[in-house]
Amino acid sequence: MPVNPYLTFRVATLEDVPTVLALLADDSTSGAQQGEYGETHRAAFEAIDADPGNELIVAELDGEVVGTMQLTYIPGISRGGALRMQIEAVRIASGLRGRGLGGQMLRWAVERGRARGCALVQLTTNKARKDAHRFYDSLGFVASHEGYKLALS
Protein backbone atom coordinates (compact mmCIF):
# COMPACT_ATOMS: atom_id res chain seq x y z
CA MET A 1 0.00 0.00 0.00
CA PRO A 2 1.37 3.46 -0.86
CA VAL A 3 2.54 5.67 1.99
CA ASN A 4 -0.11 8.29 1.15
CA PRO A 5 -3.10 6.50 -0.45
CA TYR A 6 -6.04 8.51 -1.74
CA LEU A 7 -9.32 8.61 0.18
CA THR A 8 -12.83 9.20 -1.10
CA PHE A 9 -15.49 10.80 1.06
CA ARG A 10 -19.25 10.49 1.35
CA VAL A 11 -22.10 11.10 3.75
CA ALA A 12 -22.56 8.03 5.94
CA THR A 13 -25.56 5.73 5.74
CA LEU A 14 -27.21 3.83 8.58
CA GLU A 15 -25.31 0.74 7.45
CA ASP A 16 -22.03 2.56 8.16
CA VAL A 17 -22.85 3.27 11.82
CA PRO A 18 -21.39 0.03 13.29
CA THR A 19 -18.12 0.70 11.44
CA VAL A 20 -18.12 4.33 12.60
CA LEU A 21 -18.62 3.14 16.19
CA ALA A 22 -15.71 0.71 15.83
CA LEU A 23 -13.48 3.55 14.60
CA LEU A 24 -14.56 5.75 17.50
CA ALA A 25 -13.98 2.94 19.99
CA ASP A 26 -10.42 2.41 18.72
CA ASP A 27 -9.18 5.38 20.73
CA SER A 28 -7.38 5.41 24.04
CA THR A 29 -9.00 8.63 25.30
CA SER A 30 -12.67 8.02 24.47
CA GLY A 31 -13.08 4.50 23.15
CA ALA A 32 -14.80 3.13 26.24
CA GLN A 33 -17.53 5.79 25.93
CA GLN A 34 -19.01 4.34 22.72
CA GLY A 35 -21.01 1.35 23.97
CA GLU A 36 -22.51 -1.39 21.84
CA TYR A 37 -24.44 -0.46 18.70
CA GLY A 38 -28.10 -0.05 19.57
CA GLU A 39 -31.25 1.99 19.28
CA THR A 40 -29.68 5.16 20.73
CA HIS A 41 -27.05 5.11 17.97
CA ARG A 42 -29.72 4.54 15.32
CA ALA A 43 -31.78 7.45 16.67
CA ALA A 44 -28.71 9.71 16.80
CA PHE A 45 -27.80 8.81 13.22
CA GLU A 46 -31.35 9.48 12.03
CA ALA A 47 -31.33 12.89 13.74
CA ILE A 48 -27.96 13.77 12.18
CA ASP A 49 -29.07 12.54 8.77
CA ALA A 50 -32.31 14.56 8.89
CA ASP A 51 -30.56 17.79 9.93
CA PRO A 52 -29.06 19.81 7.04
CA GLY A 53 -26.73 21.42 9.59
CA ASN A 54 -25.04 18.09 10.38
CA GLU A 55 -23.14 15.54 8.34
CA LEU A 56 -21.63 12.26 9.42
CA ILE A 57 -18.85 11.66 6.91
CA VAL A 58 -16.99 8.46 6.13
CA ALA A 59 -13.66 8.16 4.35
CA GLU A 60 -13.13 5.15 2.12
CA LEU A 61 -9.98 3.51 0.85
CA ASP A 62 -10.52 0.96 -1.92
CA GLY A 63 -14.22 0.78 -1.00
CA GLU A 64 -13.62 0.14 2.72
CA VAL A 65 -14.61 2.68 5.40
CA VAL A 66 -11.36 3.62 7.16
CA GLY A 67 -12.19 7.02 8.63
CA THR A 68 -14.99 9.18 9.96
CA MET A 69 -15.80 12.67 11.20
CA GLN A 70 -18.90 14.67 12.03
CA LEU A 71 -19.35 18.13 10.54
CA THR A 72 -21.78 20.58 12.11
CA TYR A 73 -22.63 23.93 10.53
CA ILE A 74 -23.38 26.58 13.14
CA PRO A 75 -24.95 29.93 12.28
CA GLY A 76 -23.98 32.68 14.68
CA ILE A 77 -24.44 36.32 15.51
CA SER A 78 -20.75 36.81 16.32
CA ARG A 79 -18.19 37.48 13.61
CA GLY A 80 -20.75 39.47 11.63
CA GLY A 81 -23.28 36.64 11.48
CA ALA A 82 -20.71 34.17 10.18
CA LEU A 83 -21.44 30.51 9.59
CA ARG A 84 -18.87 28.22 11.19
CA MET A 85 -18.10 24.54 10.87
CA GLN A 86 -17.42 22.38 13.91
CA ILE A 87 -15.41 19.21 13.20
CA GLU A 88 -15.79 16.41 15.74
CA ALA A 89 -15.05 12.72 16.20
CA VAL A 90 -12.21 12.57 13.65
CA ARG A 91 -10.83 9.04 13.43
CA ILE A 92 -8.68 7.00 11.06
CA ALA A 93 -8.33 3.24 11.41
CA SER A 94 -5.40 2.67 13.78
CA GLY A 95 -3.49 0.52 11.30
CA LEU A 96 -3.52 3.35 8.75
CA ARG A 97 -2.45 6.25 10.94
CA GLY A 98 0.70 8.15 10.04
CA ARG A 99 0.13 7.89 6.27
CA GLY A 100 -1.35 11.33 5.64
CA LEU A 101 -4.98 10.20 5.64
CA GLY A 102 -5.99 12.47 8.52
CA GLY A 103 -4.57 15.43 6.63
CA GLN A 104 -6.62 14.46 3.58
CA MET A 105 -9.73 14.26 5.75
CA LEU A 106 -9.22 17.65 7.38
CA ARG A 107 -8.34 19.40 4.11
CA TRP A 108 -11.47 17.90 2.53
CA ALA A 109 -13.59 19.08 5.47
CA VAL A 110 -12.16 22.61 5.29
CA GLU A 111 -12.98 22.79 1.57
CA ARG A 112 -16.49 21.49 2.26
CA GLY A 113 -16.95 24.23 4.85
CA ARG A 114 -15.63 26.84 2.46
CA ALA A 115 -18.05 25.62 -0.24
CA ARG A 116 -20.96 25.98 2.21
CA GLY A 117 -19.95 29.55 3.02
CA CYS A 118 -18.30 29.00 6.39
CA ALA A 119 -16.07 31.81 7.60
CA LEU A 120 -14.41 29.67 10.27
CA VAL A 121 -13.64 26.02 10.95
CA GLN A 122 -13.20 24.96 14.56
CA LEU A 123 -12.55 21.74 16.40
CA THR A 124 -11.85 20.51 19.88
CA THR A 125 -9.50 17.78 20.96
CA ASN A 126 -8.75 16.03 24.22
CA LYS A 127 -5.94 17.75 26.14
CA ALA A 128 -4.16 14.40 26.49
CA ARG A 129 -3.87 13.94 22.71
CA LYS A 130 -0.52 15.70 22.21
CA ASP A 131 0.08 14.04 18.82
CA ALA A 132 -3.30 15.30 17.64
CA HIS A 133 -2.40 18.82 18.79
CA ARG A 134 0.78 18.74 16.69
CA PHE A 135 -1.22 17.37 13.76
CA TYR A 136 -3.83 20.14 13.92
CA ASP A 137 -1.08 22.76 14.31
CA SER A 138 0.59 21.41 11.16
CA LEU A 139 -2.65 21.98 9.23
CA GLY A 140 -2.84 25.62 10.28
CA PHE A 141 -5.31 25.31 13.14
CA VAL A 142 -4.53 27.58 16.09
CA ALA A 143 -5.14 26.64 19.73
CA SER A 144 -6.87 29.95 20.44
CA HIS A 145 -9.49 28.95 23.02
CA GLU A 146 -9.85 26.77 26.10
CA GLY A 147 -12.85 24.43 26.04
CA TYR A 148 -14.92 23.07 28.91
CA LYS A 149 -17.42 20.24 29.18
CA LEU A 150 -20.01 19.35 31.78
CA ALA A 151 -21.30 15.77 31.63
CA LEU A 152 -25.06 15.67 32.17
CA SER A 153 -25.34 11.89 32.30
Enumerate the language-model features and the residues they cover.
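Conserved beta-strand-loop-alpha-helix junction that forms the acyl-donor binding cleft
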Residues: 122-132, 149-151
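Conserved acetyl-CoA-binding loop-helix of GNAT-fold acetyltransferases
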Residues: 89-92, 98-111, 134, 138
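Hydrophobic adenine-recognition pocket in adenosine-nucleotide-binding enzymes
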Residues: 12, 90-92, 125
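Conserved GNAT acetyl-CoA-binding A-motif
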Residues: 106, 113-125
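Conserved acetyl-CoA binding element of GNAT-fold acetyltransferases
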Residues: 81-94, 146
